[in-house]
């Protein structure tokens, strides 16, 4: 007699270092699903955990970038990072994944994002930094739930932010795989 097994999706929190990523996240009256989570290491040092929350699961960068609705990249710091290093890492990820023309077209938005990042200052172990994209086509950055600076308009900016972790030259290829694991 044949047995029929049902495959039930596993929706469970993931813990990376001391940071727990719940299977769902509520943002602006929308429930986002954890697509994947992983670890960012630099020279064998755990720097942060990252989780990608989306309206629905996605397996490729293209799916994530083209998806409508709210999105969040959540970083959970596993060590203290000074402001300059945090901003430099953001800049590096953007430079590696955009052309000069793309950066020129987004120069005002990128300057606004860098200004927001500079307002954050040093981040401490245990801090949660969210890069949010809203249905109103705005990018915002929060630290421990507190909005830093102003929201920045434009869908193209958030696509650029996503490419830091999901682009062709993502800041960490293993982390990219983990975020797209779903």
Feature names for model-found ranges:
Residues 8-12:
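Sec/Tat signal peptide C-region and signal peptidase I cleavage site
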Residues 150-175:
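Flexible glycine-rich active-site/ligand-binding loops centered on an Asp-His dyad
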Residues 143-146:
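Short strand-turn-strand beta-turns centered on an Asx-Gly dipeptide
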Residues 1-7:
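Bacterial N-terminal signal peptides
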Residues 13-65:
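N-terminal structural module
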Residues 181-182:
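Short, solvent-exposed mixed-charge patches
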Residues 23-25, 138-141:
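Short polybasic amphipathic segments
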Residues 58, 62-136:
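Mid-length scaffold segments of soluble, non-membrane domains
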């Amino acid at each position: 007699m044949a047995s029929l097994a049902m495959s039930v999706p596993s929706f469970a929190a993931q813990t990376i270092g001391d940071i727990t990523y719940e299977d769902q996240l509520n943002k602006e009256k929308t429930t986002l699903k954890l697509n994947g989570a992983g670890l960012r290491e630099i020279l064998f040092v755990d720097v942060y955990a990252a989780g990608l929350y989306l309206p629905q699961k996605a397996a490729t960068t293209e799916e994530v970038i083209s998806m409508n609705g709210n999105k969040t990249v959540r970083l959970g710091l596993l060590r203290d990072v000074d402001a300059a290093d945090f901003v430099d890492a953001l800049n590096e990820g953007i430079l590696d994944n955009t052309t000069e023309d793309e950066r020129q077209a987004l120069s005002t938005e990128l300057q606004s994002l860098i200004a927001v990042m500079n307002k954050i200052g040093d981040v401490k172990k245990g801090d949660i930094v969210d890069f949010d994209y809203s249905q109103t086509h705005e990018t915002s950055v929060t630290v421990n739930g507190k909005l830093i600076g102003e929201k920045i308009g434009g869908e193209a900016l958030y696509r650029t932010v996503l490419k830091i972790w999901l682009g062709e030259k993502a800041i960490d290829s293993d982390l990219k795989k983990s975020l797209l694991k779903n």
